[in-house]
Structure formats: structure tokens, C-alpha cells
Amino acid sequence: MKKYSLLFILMILILDISAQEKPSDFNWVQLFNGKDLNDWKVKIAGYPLGENYGNTFRVEDGKMKVSYAEYDSFGVKYGHIFYKEKYAWYIIAAEYRFTGEQAKGGQGWATRNSGIMIHGQDPVTMTKDQDFPISIEVQLLGGLGSGLRPTANLCTPGTNVVLNGKLLTAHCINSSSKTYNGDNWVRVEVMVFGDSLIRHIVNGDTVLEYTKPQIGGGNVLNADPAIKIDGNLLSEG
């Protein structure tokens, strides 16, 4: 019996809108080189920065893979992988799919559940036992075979946003995407305009947008209070 794994292909378009004048000036930059994770930092809750417990993040067949095959039990070992550079105005595109079955000991809500953390906290400032980075999460979900389960939703670990002119303090809000069952690849793009507009796009369709990402609220454990200063706008990560 396999455990769920997540396959990722990542690339990023550096918009730098303040400096560029024409869309034709934009060029895709491939973040993941298809060979190794030398440009990335791993942070797993309960472990020091850089310790890739259980070889969670790995490269197989030219793809970035998140696997729990070496876990006896998942527990609360929430893991994140951070690129070496920060960006402020950009489009990030990812193609993902889920394969296998849920890791033993994993929470029910975490089944076929991953995400892209936008404007994420510098992992150097995360505590050893912090579960999630302070960030804006573009939640990536896979269907469960029945019922609705959209993807590219918004979740807010230690953050809030403004939606339809009002401060949103709920932890997660669904996008308008359809449900993607099975193990087919899904393409997600996120347009990020500094601390103003963020837009979620799935297979070419805009499914959610909001403004003014900022630190606030809960839904993140063991964060350093010197870092989690509520009300501060998030402009890069």
C-alpha cells in the first residue's frame, strides 16, 4: 500500500512590473532544476532548518516529490520547502498531482492536501516547533472521489486578507474551481502584486482574488511573537 505523495514541477515568472513596460519583456525562470534541491531549504516541524526528515522532499524522474514513504507515523511533522530567493511581484506556476494513499497518522483534513505558500516567512525566523510559516497559502487539493473539493483555495496561517472590501479573518475560503479527482496533473498559477492584489488561476481560469495580505489572526503554532506582528502588510517572500 502506497502513502500519498505529491509531485511538483515549479517555475516562476518575475514580473517586476515597476521596472518592466511590456508583457513581452517577461521571461519564465525555472526554479526547480529537475536534478537536486540545492537551491531550496527544508523546514519540518519539530526539526531544525535544513533537516529533511525521512527524505520527505526528494527528486525522482526529474520531478520534485513530497513523499512520506519513510514515515512510521505522520503526527504533526508539517513540512515546507523554501526557495533561496525572495520575490515580490511575480507569477508562480506549478503543475501538481497526488498519488498513493494517505500517510499513516495523518489528519483527515490533510488527505490529498498541499499548498504554495505566498509571501512566506523566512524559514530562518521560524522556531523549531512552528507548524506553518506565517504566509498566504494557495491550498492545493485533490478530489476524494465524491463530492465537491475545489483547489487553489485560500488558507491563512498567521495572516488575514481583504476580500470584497472586507477584512477576512476566516482561516480558509474556497475558490470557484472544479474538483480534480484521480492522479491527473493540474496547473495552478498565482499572480502576486506585492502587498496589493493576489489572484489564483487554475488551468487558465481565475478562481479567486483578494488584496492586502497581512500578518494577523491565529492558525499558526509556536511562532516567534517578535516576528508575528499583527497588521503588518506582506509584500514579499
Go through the PLM ranges and name each one.
Residues 1-23:
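Bacterial Sec-dependent N-terminal signal peptides
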Residues 20-237:
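Carbohydrate-interacting regions of secretory-pathway proteins
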